[in-house]
Design a protein with these regions (language model features):
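Alpha-helix boundary/capping residues
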Residues: 19-22, 65-66, 74-77
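Short amphipathic alpha-helices within nucleic acid-binding modules
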Residues: 14-18, 55-64
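Short beta-strand segments enriched in hydrophobic/aromatic residues
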Residues: 9, 52-53
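Short amphipathic alpha-helical segments and helix-helix/interface helices
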Residues: 24-27, 58, 67-68
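Short glycine-/aliphatic-rich beta-strand segments at the starts of folded cytosolic domains
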Residues: 1-11
Length: 88
C-alpha cells in the first residue's frame, strides 16, 4: 500500500527540520523509508509520499505520544490523503 498526503503546518521549514527529519528513521518500522518523499508547496503546505506502507505499524506510530507531540508542536494537520494505488 502507498500513501500520499497533503498537510498544513505552522511553518514547513521548521516542521521539516525539527519534526520530519528528527523522526524519519522511525519510518522504517512502517514503510520503505528509502523511497519516502517530502516536498514543500509553500510556507504552510506540504506533500509527503510513502511507499510499501504497513497500515498496522503506521497506526501504532501515529498513536505514539512523541509523534502526537511533534504534530501538536508544529500545527501539523493532514488536509488530504489517499491509500489508493496509483495507475496510469
Amino acid at each position: 500500500m502507498n500513501l500520499m498526503l497533503t498537510a498544513k503546518c505552522n511553518n514547513v521549514d521548521e516542521f521539516k527540520k525539527n519534526g520530519y527529519d528528527v523522526v524519519k528513521k522511525e519510518f522504517d518500522s512502517w514503510c520503505d523509508n528509502s523511497k519516502s518523499i517530502f516536498a514543500k508547496i509553500d510556507d504552510n503546505n506540504l506533500v509527503e509520499l510513502f511507499f510499501d506502507v504497513n497500515p498496522v505499524e503506521l497506526k501504532k506510530w501515529l498513536e505514539k505520544e512523541s509523534t502526537q507531540n511533534i504534530f501538536k508542536t508544529h500545527g501539523f494537520f493532514p488536509t488530504r490523503y489517499t491509500f489508493e494505488g496509483l495507475s496510469m
